[in-house]
Amino acid sequence: EKGMYYVNVGEGDNRCWEDCREFGYLSAGQHPKYSDPIRTLEKGDVVAAYLKGHGYVGVGRVTNKAVRVNDFKIKGKLLGRYNLKMPNIYTNANNENSEFLVSLDWIKSVDRKNAKWKSKSNLFSSQLVKASLENQQKTVEFLEREFEINFKELFSI
């Protein structure tokens, strides 16, 4: 059974939405309490990426379970071979605080200035790295409308 999840982009010194969007991943790390949740995502799960202070910026399907940043590849090439806006993603790459990256196929994504949000409308957001959207009907309907997608169809593919 595939899940539908909220995932916090968690921008900071180690990651940025632009890299996540361009290279097809979401990441978490710098302590196991942050990386552990993203490591529970399974192939086929659908995620809605949330960028704090902006709103929802993408909906994607997990294509592979999360791996340590040193092992993450795009088209067979290690991530470090690409020109990242946020190369600090490699901080602590060799210890338990490593970033873990889950690879995604972005179904729909937008840049930060076009993030989807409606104030005072009870849309789900959280400080958590990952949370289920299963009982967040209002947010699911908002995402379907704003990103012009149908979650039921995404799960039948």
Q: Where is each model-derived feature located?
A:
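Short coil-to-beta transition motif at edge beta-strands of beta-rich domains
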Residues: 36-51
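Short, basic/aromatic beta-hairpin or loop at an interaction surface
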Residues: 11-28
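Short alpha-helix capping/helix-loop boundary micro-motifs
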Residues: 27-37
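Intrinsically disordered, low-complexity regulatory regions enriched in Ser/Pro/Gly/Thr
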Residues: 40-42, 54, 95-97
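Contiguous surface segments at macromolecular interaction interfaces
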Residues: 1-8, 12, 33, 71-157
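Beta-strand cores of modular interaction/reader domains in eukaryotic scaffold and signaling proteins
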Residues: 48, 61, 103-105
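Short beta-strand-centered aromatic/proline hotspots
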Residues: 56-67
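Beta-sheet entry/capping signal
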Residues: 4, 45-48, 59
